[in-house]
């Protein structure tokens, strides 16, 4: 037993010396001064191109404005020819809605001949109705379980005012010839068609983001929203 115990002790000591020799060898390893500790971090060409496509830091202001205007124009096309496309939702912006809102408010101001403040309250009224109404509809959509984001909904509702803005332009042109029965009938047809198109276009984009059993609860406020704007356009009378 003593001999076997001594053998195990000798074996353990040999293993210890071997490990010590192994680590001692590692301590002799050093970095040669002839080898430069430096290098280049290269990025694949495809990644560089992808980053450059979305970078606007070095882009002229003119190109940026033109690109944004083209994007707004493409969204106008989506509204006039609504279809099941996520482009309006994916690439949302508020420049188009702001432009349409200001244009519509400017054309509606001064509509009352009895206005003593040159139409300023009417401009504010149109501006507040459009944006406040859009916010209320968006909150209603979110509370009903809609999956669309807040700003995406504002974008859709704002861009879908385009048919009503076109109707306002047509009504202003028709009113240049007078405000008789024929003029009212023409304006009624134009506003009704534009109201229907705005409602149809907005629901085409928003319907898929709502639960199936709650779509009617979302469409009804949209109907009222565009109806109020259409009524303001139909009852517009230029000041003299």
UniProtKB/Swiss-Prot annotation:
GO biological processes: endoplasmic reticulum to Golgi vesicle-mediated transport
Membrane association type: Multi-pass membrane protein
Subcellular location: Golgi apparatus membrane
Residue numbers on the Cytoplasmic membrane side: 1-91, 147-149, 194-215
Keyword Membrane: yes
GO cellular component, one term: trans-Golgi network
Entry keyword annotation includes Transmembrane helix: yes
Spans traversing the lipid bilayer: 92-112, 126-146, 150-170, 173-193, 216-236
InterPro entries named among the record's database cross-references: Yip1/4-like, Yip1_dom
Primary residence: Golgi
Pfam families per the UniProt record, alphabetical: Yip1
Residue ranges, Lumenal side: 113-125, 171-172, 237-240
Keywords linked to the UniProt accession: Golgi apparatus, Membrane, Transmembrane, Transmembrane helix
Protein family (similarity comment): Belongs to the YIP1 family.
Protein name as annotated: Protein YIPF6
Originating gene: yipf6
